[in-house]
């Protein structure tokens, strides 16, 4: 029975789509027949290419299936591309407060387009963009202005939901839009709880990954604590600058770590003031800490990152303001509240500015106390005095008042000037024996006098003649007050004289300044002088102008901006490579000079150190050993009875006030 279902009207059997066809094969050639090489070309009329032309009538319904197939293939390709992109994209960082990380929110193209910084207003086309749940766009305006934290979190949540919709499978048929809307609606209802739990992670990741994350942290600090972070700190530009006191604010900390931090930080610190507040990012920890050893910013950041498991870029680290009364009052008042954990002794800079007793102790600056400090520490250089006295501000009230004054440069200059006057007056009232004893008492430790004698013997210098010349030299006997050390280079002449000059506190004059009228001015303030490396021109100058100075008689010295000074020239040491006794030009200097020759090269050890050590301790031992031989004043009576003179004091006495 024929099956005519699905056909219209009567048709033959061959025209039916479901009928059977009879196919017969016609064999023109058999196996083994010879075939010409060009037979196919001659018989080919091109009729076999007719089947490649599609001459079907338009609208027969097959293009719908092809379009559907293309759409399905395109959808599958897009899903594969997104899968590859997600596979090779770096995993984002999640704050410890994030319970359920949302990968869809992090990898969503819409969330990635959100930036806190100002972007260009030019619209850009994104590659591989999938149409979302009925709101897909091919143009995305990347301009974003300043936004609040709450707006960014909301946008991140919405985009996370849309990203989740994009990751699901889609139907591209006629009902595709309805299925997408239904799938998107189901996703929102099912992910409402997870989006709410991920609000903290969205806020931290959206804000702390911004280009200007420090400004964001500063704004969040002011929102939480009610004041600016810069009002409590002073800025260190270098991360290598060390300080013992630091203010550290850490954002996004686990609640359990924030509580345990109060105990973990104690072994490292002498004082710690800890405040813990909660916010939508997690726990915020504000700490004022004084470490047992001074640390730089990098060391502090690494330590806090280890204790709190938070990246270093989630921290604000600066030293506190030490001379700000409002800042000190803030730390003092918050330490009394129940929101702070405090242990250790309160820093002195807080006590000084908050406790009434310490505030009353602040006094005006006294120049005499600064002069006394410079005199006691033998400081006559202005820069050294300013630095050393400023370091005493933490323990000395007068030094603190000095730092608070507006005339520091004037005070330093006046203090150094007065200290030099006192030192010069003290030196002028001493003879050479008292001066040597005074210089020796300042040197700590005992040395050995033998290296000095051994070095003189190494240079073939007779010790007894040298001792006699040194005795006359120290006593200032006329025509015996100048000792010359002559010899070739590298024999230790300058080393020997410089070590003796340092012990006696002498001065050095240089012939290079001889064109000035004031080049001899240092001799007016010293007990001994040194002219190093005298040349032939220098000897001619001495022979012409300084004969009476070598005699040890009274000379007149010109001083800058002062009147001429008449004084007895102090004993003078001279080193030279020219023998002044062998030249007839300087025959009048022969009776005024005591010459010792150093012919041997100065010996050194294998490490490059001097074989003979000539230091202050050895010279102290040398003078103590040969005190009587040098005919110096015998200090035995003073040692037995003690020093009757009182130490110099330029600070007026104070009466003790009873309470």
From Swiss-Prot:
Biased composition, class Acidic residues, residue ranges: 36-52
PTM description: Phosphorylated.
Catalysis performed (reactions): Couples ATP hydrolysis with the unwinding of duplex DNA by translocating in the 3'-5' direction; ATP + H2O = ADP + phosphate + H(+)
Keywords assigned: ATP-binding, DNA replication, DNA-binding, Early protein, Helicase, Host nucleus, Hydrolase, Isomerase, Isopeptide bond, Nucleotide-binding, Phosphoprotein, Ubl conjugation
Motif mapping: Nuclear localization signal: 85-87
Composition bias type Polar residues, residue spans: 135-160
Its EC number(s): 5.6.2.4
Motif (Nuclear export signal): 107-116
UniProt: ATP binding residues: 487-494
Family designation: Belongs to the papillomaviridae E1 protein family.
Protein name per Swiss-Prot or TrEMBL: Replication protein E1
Organism: Human papillomavirus 3
Lineage: Viruses, Monodnaviria, Shotokuvirae, Cossaviricota, Papovaviricetes
Gene name as annotated: E1
């Amino acid at each position: 029975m024929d099956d005519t279902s699905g056909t219209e009207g009567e048709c033959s059997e061959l025209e039916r789509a479901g009928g059977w066809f009879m196919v017969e094969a016609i064999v023109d050639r058999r196996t083994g027949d010879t075939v010409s090489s060009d037979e196919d070309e001659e018989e080919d009329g091109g009729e076999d290419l007719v089947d490649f032309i599609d001459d079907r009538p338009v609208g027969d319904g097959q293009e719908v299936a092809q379009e559907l197939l293309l759409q399905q293939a395109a959808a599958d390709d897009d899903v594969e591309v997104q899968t590859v992109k997600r596979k090779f994209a770096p995993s984002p960082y999640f704050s410890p407060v994030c319970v359920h990380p949302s990968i869809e929110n992090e990898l969503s193209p819409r969330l990635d387009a959100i930036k806190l910084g100002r972007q260009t207003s030019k619209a850009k086309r994104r590659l591989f963009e999938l149409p979302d749940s009925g709101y897909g766009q091919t143009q995305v305006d990347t301009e974003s202005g300043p936004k609040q934290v709450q707006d960014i979190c909301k946008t991140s949540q919405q985009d996370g939901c849309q990203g989740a919709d994009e990751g699901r499978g889609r139907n591209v048929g006629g009902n595709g839009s309805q299925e997408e809307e239904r799938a998107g609606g189901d996703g929102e209802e099912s992910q409402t709880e997870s989006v709410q739990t991920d609000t903290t992670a969205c806020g931290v990741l959206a804000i702390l990954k911004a280009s200007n994350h420090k400004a964001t942290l500063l704004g969040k600090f002011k929102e939480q604590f009610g004041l600016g972070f810069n009002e409590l700190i002073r800025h260190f530009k270098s991360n290598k600058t060390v300080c013992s006191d630091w203010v550290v604010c850490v954002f996004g900390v686990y609640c359990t770590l924030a509580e345990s931090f109060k105990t973990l930080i104690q072994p490292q610190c002498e004082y710690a003031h800890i405040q813990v507040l909660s916010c939508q990012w997690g726990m915020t920890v504000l700490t004022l800490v004084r470490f047992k050893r001074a640390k730089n910013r990098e060391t502090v950041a690494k330590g806090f990152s280890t204790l709190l498991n938070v990246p270093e870029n989630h921290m604000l680290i600066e030293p506190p303001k030490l001379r700000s009364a409002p800042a000190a009052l803030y730390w003092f008042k918050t330490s009394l509240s129940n929101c702070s954990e405090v242990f250790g002794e309160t820093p002195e800079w807080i006590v000084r500015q908050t406790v009434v007793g310490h505030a009353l102790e602040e006094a005006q600056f006294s120049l005499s106390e600064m002069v006394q400090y410079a005199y006691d520490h033998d400081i006559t250089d202005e820069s050294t005095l300013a630095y050393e006295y400023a370091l005493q501000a933490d323990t000395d009230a007068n030094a603190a008042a000095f730092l608070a004054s507006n005339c520091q440069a004037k005070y330093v200059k006046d203090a150094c000037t007065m200290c030099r006057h006192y030192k010069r007056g003290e030196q002028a009232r001493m003879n050479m024996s008292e001066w040597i004893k005074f210089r020796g008492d300042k040197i700590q430790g005992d040395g050995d006098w033998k290296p000095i004698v051994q070095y003189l013997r190494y240079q073939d210098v007779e010790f007894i003649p040298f001792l006699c010349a040194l005795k006359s030299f120290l006593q200032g006997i006329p025509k015996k007050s100048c000792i010359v050390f002559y010899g070739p280079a590298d024999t230790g002449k300058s080393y020997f004289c410089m070590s003796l000059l340092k012990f006696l506190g002498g001065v050095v004059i240089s012939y290079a300044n001889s064109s000035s009228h004031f080049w001899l001015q240092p001799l007016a303030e010293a007990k001994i002088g040194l002219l190093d490396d005298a040349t032939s021109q220098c000897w001619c100058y001495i022979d012409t102008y300084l004969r009476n100075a070598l005699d040890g008689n009274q000379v007149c010295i010109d001083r800058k901006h002062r009147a001429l000074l008449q004084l007895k020239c102090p004993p003078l040491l001279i080193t030279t490579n020219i023998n002044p006794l062998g030249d007839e030009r300087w025959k009048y200097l022969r009776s005024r000079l005591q010459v010792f020759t150093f012919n041997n090269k100065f010996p050194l050890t294998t490490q490059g150190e001097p074989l003979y050590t000539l230091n202050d301790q050895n010279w102290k031992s040398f003078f103590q050993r040969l005190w009587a031989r040098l005919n110096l004043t015998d200090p035995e009576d003073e040692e037995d009875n003690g020093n009757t003179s009182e130490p110099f004091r330029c600070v007026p006495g104070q009466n003790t006030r009873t309470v």
